[in-house]
Amino acid sequence: MNFNIIDWTYNPYDHTGYIFILHKMEYVLDLAYFFIKTRDEGIKEIIFDILNSWYLSCNDKLDNPWIFHDHATALRAFNISKFLNIMKNYISEDQFLLLQKILAIDVNKLLMDEFYSKNTNHGLDQSLSLYKASFFLEVDNILDIRNVAIERINSELKFAFCDDGGHKENSPAYLYYGVSQVLRALDIGYKYEKENTKIYFPLDLLKKSCLVLGYFVQFNEKMPLIGDTVEFKINNFL
């Protein structure tokens, strides 16, 4: 396959889900895990053909709403950071530099106030991705980037929940996702900075939110179909 002719803006299905999956790049992690298991250099070659094609095609399209969707950009930065972590012992200097270039593009985009989806679940994911990326991107102002991320994370967490534990986006699904985001934020802060983490959420409020979520769960372990909630079971929540 000739990756050099891929049009990363092409959406043959005219479907937002397709283009979202294409640009969040979770499949790159799947390929990385497959490479680590098999040590098949052909798999790694495919990975970097994909990444190089994306970089050459997209680095000058910073205003394209498909490539730089507010949520897809956040998840791509998160996935590239994770890729750097799990593949650090298997990549060349040139491959490392390519990943740094891609991550820098996404980080710079996420830093822009006009791109930041403030006070939304997307904004929190953007901030969490910015925080994670600050441990893998090698630039001089990395501490400034991390501090911006921490400030945004704490602001998003404070805004998202009411005093009674409810979620302001106001559906069972968003409460579930919101509590999941809180736990992920606390976990990622401890993972990278241990007791020095500055990411904060009041424990009493978290307990209230978990209690509210518990009252939402029906006898069949599913959430009521209120608002934009779709049918799903809560599994391994904590």
Language-model segments: which ranges?
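Aromatic-lined, polymer-binding surfaces characteristic
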Residues: 15-217
